């Protein structure tokens, strides 16, 4: 590829002194760093990013409606963005996931974790022979055809299903899309296996791509704390933690969620694993309200699992999210018997591990209890975090012993 060919790309010129993050290979360019766009670029189209003197820095995708004006595809000037590019990225990701799948006996895993796999705005989860695709950025959508072609090359025997029906697409001026791309339609509930559990996944209608694969290791870790214990499983979704708790020998597990459909699948998951259904209770309720009601009625638990949805989407919401996390963890701490275990998580990328730990400490003070941090959690290894993109470490959690 010649330099003259590269010059055909529109150029995004950065303001003076705003190239430092790109020199450190961070994959985002924020609106405040942009001086001007030279040439015309459509939504999601490939552009070259240069400093204020015209020095080439990266090649990325243009998104004029987003606070993230450009997401970097490559820091290699010789690399063009085409089917071969996406095939290379997929092969790199495939190598790691194939090793993990063989090592841990996985039939389902995250194949592409966005920026950390060099494909910003692209999420791909594999469930058996189904690949579930989410395109979350303008650049990813613009390259849809090339990406799907690369997927078919790397996974010729897999069906592809699109779950790009997430609200974040609206921020970049894109419509929501969902439906089969290639191959057959996924069944209403697809069985997968995870650490000895059989679990039903709703690819077409479930949260995100159908199941939270990132919590795989945390669900397994739960088993060491639950033998003969009474467990409260908050924001239970389809019951992965509940099934794991029952496999760990818990005395009872109460699963709470606002979705009756999710609770119905959770019940089916307990039955599918031939576990004692009499030890499992399913409650459709708002977790905040129910915890306060439990406190009022003197309910107590030995283990509480707190795995809420994302409380914060942007920095302006961070303070409110901190209050929400503090309130809900304070309530959980108050409901635990002395020596009880709180397994608490945050999936908000803007919530750092240090800040989350401080929130738990503050919640313990407000609850009037002493808390020991005994274990730390993060997303499973099929959700890697590239060193230049710390935002990729979005899931964090702690096991806490409440005195």
Curated annotation (Swiss-Prot):
Assigned keywords, A-Z: Cytoplasm, Methyltransferase, RNA-binding, rRNA processing, S-adenosyl-L-methionine, Transferase
Similarity comment: family membership: Belongs to the methyltransferase superfamily. RlmI family.
Top-level EC class: transferase
Entry annotated with the keyword Zinc-finger: no
Name of the gene encoding the protein in the UniProt record: rlmI
Segments passing through the bilayer: none
Segments forming domain PUA: 9-88
Catalytic activity: cytidine(1962) in 23S rRNA + S-adenosyl-L-methionine = 5-methylcytidine(1962) in 23S rRNA + S-adenosyl-L-homocysteine + H(+)
One GO CC term on file: cytoplasm
Species for this entry: Salmonella schwarzengrund (strain CVM19633)
InterPro entries in the cross-refs: PUA, PUA-like_sf, PUA_sf, RLMI, RlmI-like_PUA, SAM-dep_methyl-trfase, SAM-dependent_MTases_sf
Organism ancestry: Bacteria, Pseudomonadati, Pseudomonadota, Gammaproteobacteria, Enterobacterales
Annotated coiled-coil segments of the chain: none
Compartments reported by the entry: Cytoplasm
GO molecular function: RNA binding; rRNA (cytosine) methyltransferase activity
SMART domains membership: PUA
PROSITE patterns, alphabetized: PUA
Stated name of the protein: Ribosomal RNA large subunit methyltransferase I
EC number: 2.1.1.191
Top-rank taxon: Bacteria
Described function: Specifically methylates the cytosine at position 1962 (m5C1962) of 23S rRNA.
Pfam families given in the database record: Methyltrans_SAM, PUA_3
């Amino acid at each position: 590829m010649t330099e003259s060919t590269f010059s055909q790309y529109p150029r995004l010129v950065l303001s003076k002194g705003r190239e430092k993050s790109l020199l450190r290979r961070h994959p985002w360019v924020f609106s405040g760093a942009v001086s001007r766009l030279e040439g015309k670029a459509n939504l999601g189209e490939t552009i070259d990013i240069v400093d204020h003197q015209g020095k080439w820095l990266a090649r990325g995708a243009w998104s004029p409606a987003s606070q993230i004006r450009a997401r970097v595809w490559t820091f290699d000037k010789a690399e063009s963005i085409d089917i071969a590019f996406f095939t290379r990225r997929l092969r790199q990701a495939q190598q790691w996931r194939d090793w993990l799948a063989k090592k841990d006996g996985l039939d389902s895993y995250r194949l592409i974790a966005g920026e950390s796999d060099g494909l910003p705005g692209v999420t791909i989860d594999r469930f058996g022979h189904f690949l579930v695709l989410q395109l979350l950025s303008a650049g990813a959508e613009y390259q849809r055809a090339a990406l799907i072609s690369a997927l078919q090359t790397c996974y010729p025997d897999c069906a592809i299903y699109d779950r790009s029906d997430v609200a974040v697409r609206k921020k970049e001026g894109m419509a929501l899309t969902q439906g089969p791309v290639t191959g057959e339609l996924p069944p209403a509930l697809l069985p997968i296996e995870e650490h000895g559990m059989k679990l039903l996944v709703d690819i077409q209608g479930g949260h995100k791509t159908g199941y939270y694969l990132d919590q795989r290791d945390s669900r397994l870790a739960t088993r060491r704390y639950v033998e003969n214990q009474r467990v409260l499983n908050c924001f239970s979704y389809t019951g992965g933690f509940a099934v794991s708790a029952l496999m760990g020998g818990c005395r009872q597990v109460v699963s709470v969620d606002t979705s009756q459909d999710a609770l119905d699948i959770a019940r089916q998951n307990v039955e599918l694993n031939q576990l004692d259904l009499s030890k499992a209770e399913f409650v459709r309720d708002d977790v905040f309200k129910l915890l306060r009601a439990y406190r009022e009625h003197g309910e107590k638990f030995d283990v509480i699992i707190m795995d809420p949805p994302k409380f914060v989407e942007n920095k302006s919401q961070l303070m409110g999210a901190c209050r929400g996390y503090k309130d809900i963890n304070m309530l959980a701490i108050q409901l635990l018997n002395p020596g009880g275990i709180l397994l608490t998580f945050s999936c908000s990328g803007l919530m750092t591990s240090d800040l989350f730990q401080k929130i738990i400490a503050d919640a313990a003070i407000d609850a009037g209890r002493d808390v020991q941090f005994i274990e730390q959690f993060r997303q499973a290894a099929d959700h890697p975090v590239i060193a230049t993109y710390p935002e990729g470490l979005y899931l964090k959690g702690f096991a806490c012993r409440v005195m």
